[in-house]
């Protein structure tokens, strides 16, 4: 099997050269079909059964599941195929040309995270996958950078229940067993326009929003006081007011005001509970001004996530790497994979390179990442 696949660096080069940008703006958004075709071909060459799954509600996006072995359990290695858009003016290199310089591999997706599939393929090139005693699954998802539609759809529709999963996001090979969630909402207040010379003839949406913000700040303080998870650097749920806009002229009563806010819940906090707390906080404003205040999602919410600290996956990975698992504040697809099986986030490259111009992965990660993948496959699929 050694000669079936291109060399590691050529696999990496081909992945980076295949654009797969996800963006909410349609003009920037791209299908990942070409990248999925590449991956499907390579995993087929290694003897995997490959299924390509269209993801509903997306602009021609696909998941790919490569599987081998029979029976229950096994290991799932997973990652996303898409990247964020890039600012051409801030890149000093071609984002779609893999460039090696100063012990770094430069290119869009080198760290976050198309390169992870090159590591998987390279680690498996000399493995006879037909002889594995438990199943091995490779999942490539769509739209992680926007809606996480691929991971959501896969977790909702699959019957697979592996023993455990590893998501190869860039963690500098530091295993992550928990992270916060993310909820982003828009609060809209509808007033009544009028001339500013007679305020009583209108309803000023900015004034109503001022009242609403006061109640939201009380909720922020309540969340901070009620919920704690000491392992996080910020050990409580955060609430941020990120954007506000209202009105169109200084001499007009504001007819509409819109506030964008987010909450980052701790693991174990349900999205329904948080939505209930927000609605309860804003209830006094809604009761005083019926029909004038609404709350809606800006993006599909992401729950917090935690892998049980005493699970075998945590024990095995900590032993292999000689380091303890950690927790982080950013989000991944882990909450959706965790509904299927215990999941860790663990991969090469630094999260500090994610979404940055001149993104790179340090070559020092190449050898230990290959070894780690080989070891976890051996442990969970051969034993």
Swiss-Prot record:
- Sites binding Zn(2+) 1 sit at 80, 112, 169
Give me any GO biological process, just one.
Answer: L-arginine biosynthetic process
The cofactors named for this UniProt entry are:
Zn(2+); Co(2+); glutathione
Catalytic reaction annotation: N(2)-acetyl-L-ornithine + H2O = L-ornithine + acetate
Which compartments does it reside in? Cytoplasm
Q: What GO terms fall under cellular component here?
A: cytoplasm
Cofactor details (free text): Binds 2 Zn(2+) or Co(2+) ions per subunit.
Q: What is its main location?
A: cytoplasm
Pathway(s) served: Amino-acid biosynthesis; L-arginine biosynthesis; L-ornithine from N(2)-acetyl-L-ornithine (linear): step 1/1
Note the Gene3D superfamilies from the entry. Answer: 3.30.70.360, Zn peptidases
Residues holding Zn(2+) 2: 112, 145, 355
**Which family would the database say this protein is a member of?**
Belongs to the peptidase M20A family. ArgE subfamily.
Q: Which PANTHER family match?
A: ACETYLORNITHINE DEACETYLASE
Subunit description: Homodimer.
General function of this protein = Catalyzes the hydrolysis of the amide bond of N(2)-acetylated L-amino acids. Cleaves the acetyl group from N-acetyl-L-ornithine to form L-ornithine, an intermediate in L-arginine biosynthesis pathway, and a branchpoint in the synthesis of polyamines.
Q: What is this protein called?
A: Acetylornithine deacetylase
- Report the source organism: Salmonella agona (strain SL483)
Recall the taxonomic lineage recorded for the source organism: Bacteria, Pseudomonadati, Pseudomonadota, Gammaproteobacteria, Enterobacterales
